[in-house]
């Protein structure tokens, strides 16, 4: 059985890890980096770039370069968070037939899981290159506050990428695993994991206990905001730059997608620089042009200015911390360690706010970029049976229930319930002789069902005619270890039953997933063919270059017919290399190799002759030197000669 890899599928960056024995290993990608930008570019010729190559070309291809797609996964187009992003993203966010938020790229509509699958495929390939064997199984992390639709969509992304997703695990829980497995402290410890990433914020309170030599990780509570992260911090900087430039130059950059892409890059860079310095300069020549000529952008931003711009965003993270502490039934003073996860936690102001709230410094021995992937790899080794000394008890982040009479949300499973879990409750009909009931499933904390997120609905039909309130319909909720919900309804009188795995009444259908899997496989084949064609062209170019060079130096030593044959073979190979037929290129490479065999023999003979002359000249020079030396100092040479004889 192959390794189960751990993947942190991030909004801004992604990371992959495995366990070697008991030691976690974060794997470097093909560019040599331990994290990969979650950026995907769709090129004109059909090529798909992922990671650093996609990021490098974003400025010149903003409409077809997708980033922060995780913010759209499992969401409806009409949601206010999605509507907010439509005005900010340089790429098109469109409404799918099922009402989901999809993206529009080069005249095609793509589902967010399909786009995220490209990043997962890159992570899969990174692990395969390192391990030297195929990888088919993974543990993928999601924000703890992801709802059922978002978890399901992430699982779908894994399937499209060719991965069997063994477990969906919460990011803060994964970070706690990475932290806890590394420590040898005895006794129970309560830790707070504050996770502020590129697009999401989570806070989890977790208890780590030693139970008979087994480390038990129990999540006491979790809270967060799935639309708050580094992307929002970047946007505050971008808005500030646009405002300042408009005041100074009278030009609105927000309407220029090329300028926006350059501003996005500059804002991210400035934000990172201001974590270690007090001031930075944004310098973007030729940012735009008007009738008076080109315009240049030059602006200084201080750390204090950045902190003022994002203060409200940082403050927004504190309320979920209060709620999580309250829900866990602990006091702030009970927290033994605070762990910071996510790139945004490098910002000094974020660290200061966390310190003020928890009354202690956060741990500095956890890598905020890698801890989540490492934790996922540890969970992978637990699932594969390689580790048996770890028990993980996670929770469902939001309450689950159904709509009952009057539009009320009747909760079946409360938030922060340890998963997996089951719950059943008996309901009845609202009307006399009602032949069917519709079960509408919701997730959230509001009292009225419409204030919560609707996950799906289904019907139970064939109820025997009876007065209202008489039939007994048992509704059961079952949450698996991935946090994904299965709901059933059963008429106790007739035994009629209906069960579904909740897939938001949007989400991807099985047919759509299968089609995307096939597309991905076809793309992988196409990528392989494209790479083989590129290799063949490179080989052809190298052979043409070396043959031409040899022909220039040794051509006059060949007969005219031989020379013409080689030149014709070069031309044939050049023509083939311009085409797209790898077999044709290979055939012409062989033809040129055969045609230039005589030339190769001439080159080899010439090199041997040169080497022979060099050796002879060297020997002659040494002999001459010896003869010259003899008359000058005959005795020394004789004495040396006799001394050698004596030793024999």
UniProtKB/Swiss-Prot annotation:
- The answer to whether the entry has keyword Ion transport is no
Report the induction information: By stress conditions e.g. heat shock.
Modified residue Phosphothreonine is at which positions? 200
Keyword check for Phosphoprotein, yes or no: yes
Record-level Gene Ontology MF annotations: ATP binding; ATP-dependent protein folding chaperone; unfolded protein binding
Show the SUPFAM superfamilies listed in the entry: Actin-like ATPase domain (SSF53067), Heat shock protein 70kD (HSP70), C-terminal subdomain (SSF100934), Heat shock protein 70kD (HSP70), peptide-binding domain (SSF100920)
Pfam families, A to Z: HSP70
Ranges for region Disordered: 612-635
Q: Which residues form a coiled coil?
A: none
Q: Print the keywords alphabetically.
A: ATP-binding, Chaperone, Nucleotide-binding, Phosphoprotein, Stress response
What does the UniProt record say this protein does?
A: Acts as a chaperone.
Mind telling me which HAMAP family this protein's record contains? DnaK
Concerning its family, UniProt says:
Belongs to the heat shock protein 70 family.
Full protein name: Chaperone protein DnaK
Q: Which organism is it from?
A: Cupriavidus metallidurans (strain ATCC 43123 / DSM 2839 / NBRC 102507 / CH34)
Specify the taxonomic lineage: Bacteria, Pseudomonadati, Pseudomonadota, Betaproteobacteria, Burkholderiales
């Amino acid at each position: 059985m192959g390794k189960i890899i751990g993947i942190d599928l991030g909004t801004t960056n992604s990371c992959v890890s495995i366990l070697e024995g008991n030691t976690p290993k974060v794997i470097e990608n093909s560019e040599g980096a331990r994290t990969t930008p979650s950026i995907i570019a769709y090129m004109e010729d059909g090529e798909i770039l992922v990671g650093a190559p996609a990021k490098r070309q974003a400025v010149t291809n903003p409409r077809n370069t997708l980033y922060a797609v995780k913010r759209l996964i499992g969401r409806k187009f009409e949601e206010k968070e999605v509507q907010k992003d439509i005005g900010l993203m340089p790429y098109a966010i469109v409404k799918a037939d099922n009402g989901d938020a999809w993206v529009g790229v080069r005249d095609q509509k793509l589902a967010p899981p399909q786009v995220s699958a490209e990043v997962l495929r890159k992570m899969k390939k990174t692990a395969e290159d390192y391990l030297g064997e195929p990888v088919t199984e993974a543990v993928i992390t999601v924000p703890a506050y992801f709802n059922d639709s978002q978890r399901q969509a992430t699982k779908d992304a894994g399937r499209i990428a060719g991965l069997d997703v063994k477990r969906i695990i919460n990011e803060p829980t994964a970070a706690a695993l990475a932290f806890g497995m590394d420590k040898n402290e005895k006794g129970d410890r309560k830790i707070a994991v504050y996770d502020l990433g590129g697009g999401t914020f989570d806070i989890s309170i977790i208890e780590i206990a030693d139970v008979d030599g087994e480390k038990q990780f129990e999540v006491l509570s979790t809270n967060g905001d799935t639309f708050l992260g580094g992307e929002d911090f970047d946007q505050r900087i971008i808005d500030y730059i646009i405002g300042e430039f408009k005041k100074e130059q009278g030009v609105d950059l927000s309407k220029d997608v090329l300028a926006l892409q350059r501003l996005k890059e500059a804002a991210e860079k400035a934000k990172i620089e201001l974590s270690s310095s007090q001031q930075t300069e944004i310098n973007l020549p030729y940012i735009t042009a008007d009738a008076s000529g080109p315009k240049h952008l030059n602006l200084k931003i201080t750390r204090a200015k950045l902190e003022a711009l994002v203060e409200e965003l940082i403050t927004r993270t504190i309320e979920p911390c209060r709620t999580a502490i309250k829900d866990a039934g602990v006091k702030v003073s009970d927290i033994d360690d605070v762990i910071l996860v996510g790139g945004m936690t490098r910002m000094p102001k974020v660290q200061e706010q966390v310190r003020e709230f928890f009354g202690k410094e956060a741990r500095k021995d956890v890598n905020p970029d890698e801890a989540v992937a490492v934790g996922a790899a540890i969970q992978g080794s637990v699932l594969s049976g390689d580790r048996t000394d770890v028990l993980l008890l996670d929770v469902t982040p939001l309450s689950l229930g159904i709509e009952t009479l009057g539009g009320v949300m009747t909760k079946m499973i409360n938030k922060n319930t340890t998963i997996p879990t089951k719950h059943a409750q008996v309901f009845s009909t609202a009307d006399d002789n009602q032949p069917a009931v519709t079960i509408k499933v919701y997730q959230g904390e509001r009292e009225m069902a419409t204030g919560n997120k609707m996950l799906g609905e289904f019907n139970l039909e064939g109820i025997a005619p009876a007065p209202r309130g008489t039939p007994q319909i048992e509704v059961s909720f079952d949450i698996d270890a991935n946090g994904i919900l299965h709901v059933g309804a059963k008429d106790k009188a007739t035994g009629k039953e209906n069960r579904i795995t909740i897939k938001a009444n949007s989400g991807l259908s099985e047919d759509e997933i299968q089609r995307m899997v096939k597309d991905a496989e076809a793309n992988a084949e196409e990528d392989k063919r494209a790479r083989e064609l590129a290799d063949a062209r490179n080989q052809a170019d190298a052979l043409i270059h070396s043959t031409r060079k040899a022909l220039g130096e040794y051509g006059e030593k060949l007969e005219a017919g031989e020379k013409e044959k080689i030149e014709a073979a070069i031309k044939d190979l050049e023509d083939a290399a311009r085409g797209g037929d790898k077999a044709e290129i290979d055939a012409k490479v062989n033809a040129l190799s055969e045609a230039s065999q005589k030339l190769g023999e001439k080159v080899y003979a010439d090199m041997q002759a040169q080497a022979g002359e060099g050796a002879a000249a060297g020997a002659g020079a040494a002999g001459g030197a010896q003869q010259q030396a003899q008359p000058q100092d005959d005795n020394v040479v004789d004495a040396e000669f006799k001394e050698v004889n004596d030793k024999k």
